[in-house]
Amino acid sequence: MDAKTDDSAGKCPFTGGGRRGHRNRDWWPEQLDLDVLHRNSTLSDPMGEDFDYAEEFKSLDLNAVIQDLHALMTDSQDWWPADFGHYGGLMIRMAWHSAGTYRITDGRGGAGAGQQRFAPLNSWPDNANLDKARRMLWPIKQKYGRKISWADLMILAGNVALESMGFKTFGFAGGRKDVWEPEELFWGPEGTWLGDERYSGERQLSEPLAAVQMGLIYVNPEGPNGNPDPVAAAKDIRETFYRMAMNDEETVALIAGGHTFGKTHGAGDPSLIGPDPEGAAIEDQGLGWKSGHGTGFGADTITGGPEVTWSQTPTRWSNYFFENLFGYEWELTKSPAGAWQWKAKNAEATVPDAHDPSKKHVPTMLTTDLSLRFDPIYEKISRRFLENPDQFADAFARAWFKLTHRDMGPKVRYLGPLVPKETLIWQDPIPEVDHVLVDDQDIAGLKAKILASGLSVSELVSTAWASASTFRGSDKRGGANGARIRLAPQKDWEVNDPAQLAKVLQRLEAIQGEFNAAQAGGKKISLADLIVLGGCAAVEKAARDAGVDVKVPFTPGRMDASQEQTDIDSFRALEPRADGFRNYLSGRQFMMPEEALVDRAQLLRLTAPEMTVLLGGLRVLGANSGGSEHGVLTKQVGKLTNDFFVNLLTMNTQWQPIADGTYEGRDRKTNELKWRATRVDLIFGAHSQLRALAEVYACGDSQEKFVQDFVAAWTKVMNADRFDLA
């Protein structure tokens, strides 16, 4: 028999001869994706489960790192020469763009995990040539190793850049732990860089997005879709920065402060730029945007398009940005790369060249810079900063600190000697524990009082879940600590059933008051702790009533925040548009219900099995918002049984959609109505992976495992914001 001569036969897939087979999502693109629940696990982390980054950072000689960063700033490299002999502008841009992906709607993005190292962020058009900044930092990262993460180092480099150019920063906190794989986020619907299919109606930006185009951090510097209209650009700026948790004053300070330093790069034809880092040749070793214009670097650098230097002293802090903005009239022009920008009319050449000390240029601005003059609200702030440079410096220092620390969560997570003493409202402050904590005997007595208070299992579980499940692992906000569920805006959220919530809180506050008044020696219990304890007591009772004795772990130490410590507008972003665990869906939700469930589970840092067991347990405990019976597939509400899974998976029930978008489950033989459910419920029988998980808990021998797994997942959510326990 002749040997096969087909050239494709036997080729090794790692040498280019193989082809990637179709994945499941290629065949079924609408399939619910659970992969997001299992990313950044210990399997992808080379540091090992015992690695404690906080302890490593505490042992770091931070001053030595800062000294090395200072030296780096003026150590110009031939392979990527520094503009004006100083890498400060480049490092500020790197830090800014690392932090600037943050969005308040879901708390995702930001600098907290060093994601700029990975695709797609490392190859976004707006991040062009920041690969060079990170390579500049590599010798320092290599020197200090595990003691400082990439995430911390990138932000610290931006801070040191500012300090090295004469600006006094507000402070710096370490504590950002690196991840080791890219985060799969929804950055927009577009399939091309700089696409803008994210708008509807009168330029209504889709949620949860903040940037105006795919691959941009903020707005298009040439104006909306390249239209050089400063007033129209101001609308984009305001919306984008608001979605990044910045008000108008912070926005003006950040734009003007950042543009006091460095320059943009548009020296030539952008078509001469090579592939981004992810698309570059293997021999380029992760460096992208190789340019065929002149030398490709230095004076020939092409990054975005505009060729703008804002200040006469681009390596020193000054007020030149505002002095130039208001001191000249501006005329529209184009950069050598063909991008819209503005130059000062009838101006002398007072701005230095980045690489030739014999050259000078007239001041230039971006369309989005002029927005700070021609938008009436921004203009008032800008003139105040022009006339009061000290106010400008303070506003920029505070806004920069907020920008670079917004996604780190509460102050208890901050590390290092440079942490500011001042506590800021956007840090969601919670008082430090100021009393003796309850002991096991106290806890047992309080549980008995709670269960004898007349509150039902459903009411106690619902309240504890509502309090704790606001936690977002993305920006470390929310959670049960602080008991903000009793404060505006959370006490009035529809999903929290305000009338029922008020009743539960009133009775728990009475128990709290009676207990605290009877104590000596400074012992107390906070309402935050009591809310969680009530939920734990209810879960124990529900399990006991279902035939399983279990102790739900409870660790006191939460405190109660005040209304004055709570930024109402900021906390509105945490209001659930959907909570599949409570079968709640508002009219403002922008995902399919089952997608929203997975999204919330990911924010809670739950795995697919944890999501499954929690939902099934909460259904039979009667924790649905509004008392809805949808998905309550049991005749024993309030008992922690596996009935949800048993009744969902039985073939005795046939499900049919009805007009309101929900489903009826009828007996196959008699057509008798047995249950009502939503897509969030039925997905656990329809989705093959979720059905496999549901089957585990529907088995005849699974009741005890179901209870134990539910308790473990419940405890994880109750303690999600207990950074003091980590």
Curated annotation (Swiss-Prot):
The record marks 93 as: Transition state stabilizer. GO terms for cellular component: cytosol. Its cofactor is heme b. It catalyses: H2O2 + AH2 = A + 2 H2O; 2 H2O2 = O2 + 2 H2O. There is a cross-link at residues 96-218 (Tryptophyl-tyrosyl-methioninium (Trp-Tyr) (with M-244)). Its EC number is 1.11.1.21. InterPro entries: Catalase_peroxidase, Haem_peroxidase, Haem_peroxidase_sf, Peroxidases_AS, Peroxidases_heam-ligand_BS. There is a cross-link at residues 218-244 (Tryptophyl-tyrosyl-methioninium (Tyr-Met) (with W-96)). One of its GO terms (molecular function) is heme binding. It is an enzyme of class 1 (oxidoreductase). Residues 1-25 are annotated as: Disordered. GO terms for biological process: cellular response to hydrogen peroxide; hydrogen peroxide catabolic process. The active site is at 97 (proton acceptor). The keyword Metal-binding applies. SUPFAM superfamilies: Heme-dependent peroxidases. Keywords: Heme, Hydrogen peroxide, Iron, Metal-binding, Oxidoreductase, Peroxidase. Binds 1 heme b (iron(II)-protoporphyrin IX) group per dimer. Bifunctional enzyme with both catalase and broad-spectrum peroxidase activity. Belongs to the peroxidase family. Peroxidase/catalase subfamily. Homodimer or homotetramer. This is Catalase-peroxidase. It comes from Chelativorans sp. (strain BNC1). The lineage of its organism: Bacteria, Pseudomonadati, Pseudomonadota, Alphaproteobacteria, Hyphomicrobiales. The gene is katG.
